[in-house]
From Swiss-Prot:
One of its GO terms (cellular component) is extracellular region. Disulfide bonds join C30-C46, C36-C51, C40-C53. This is Potassium channel toxin alpha-KTx 14.5. Expressed by the venom gland. It comes from the Eukaryota. It comes from Mesobuthus gibbosus (Mediterranean checkered scorpion). Keywords: Calcium-activated potassium channel impairing toxin, Disulfide bond, Ion channel impairing toxin, Neurotoxin, Potassium channel impairing toxin, Secreted, Signal, Toxin, Voltage-gated potassium channel impairing toxin.
């Protein structure tokens, strides 16, 4: 049973890493465009207080 949960945990971490690379599904708050350049790939703009990472 522990092995099953370990495999699920690994799959969850890998899928989150893929989402982060392709565009995060989570809202990332920002104040300026430079805040987004550190948190998202591709230097996206900051609009309405959130990074446009997609």
């Amino acid at each position: 049973m522990k092995i099953f949960f370990a495999i699920l945990l690994i799959l969850a971490v890998c899928s989150m890493a893929i989402w982060t690379v392709n565009g995060t599904p989570f809202a990332i708050r920002c104040k300026t465009d430079s805040d987004c350049s550190y948190k998202c790939p591709g230097n996206p703009p900051c609009r309405n207080g959130f990074c446009k990472c997609t």
